[in-house]
Amino acid sequence: MVEFCPKCNNIMLPKNGRLKCTVCGFEEELGNRTEEYELKEKIEAKKQEVTVIEDVDTLPTTRIECPSCGNMEASWWLQQTRCADEPETRFYKCKKCGHTWREYD
């Protein structure tokens, strides 16, 4: 069985009774599922270029609720994060607290 990270959608690998994301570091307890997971081969994660948006004042804004603070205004941008035949991912950054989250179409 393959598990994917709920934060960044990359594959999670079993390690010391836990599942760990190789990209963002998210961890999840395996509990009684340890026998389901056995690492057969280790494959190095592919490096991915990340665009850092620092000046959000130049980005378009929209009315959407921030899941962190409840503010109703965020800057947004699109980025191709998956295969070219799949839609772009929309990212939001709260204008009040700076929390960043993504939305898939």
From Swiss-Prot:
Chain sites annotated for binding Zn(2+) 2: 66, 69, 94, 97
Highest taxon of source: Archaea
Transit peptide among keywords: no
One GO term of the biological process aspect: regulation of DNA-templated transcription
A GO cellular-component term linked to this record: DNA-directed RNA polymerase complex
Keywords: DNA-binding, DNA-directed RNA polymerase, Metal-binding, Transcription, Transcription regulation, Zinc, Zinc-finger
GO molecular function, one term: DNA-directed RNA polymerase activity
Function statement: Induces RNA cleavage activity in the RNA polymerase. In its presence, the cleavage activity of the RNA polymerase truncates the RNA back to position +15 in a stepwise manner by releasing mainly dinucleotides from the 3'-end of the nascent RNA. The truncated RNAs are able to continue elongation. Involved in transcriptional proofreading and fidelity. Misincorporation of nucleotides during elongation of transcription leads to arrested elongation complexes which are rescued by TFS-promoted removal of a dinucleotide from the 3'-end.
Sequence similarity: Belongs to the archaeal RpoM/eukaryotic RPA12/RPB9/RPC11 RNA polymerase family.
PANTHER family named in the record: DNA-DIRECTED RNA POLYMERASE, DNA-DIRECTED RNA POLYMERASE III SUBUNIT RPC10
Protein name (Swiss-Prot/TrEMBL): Transcription factor S
The encoding gene: tfs
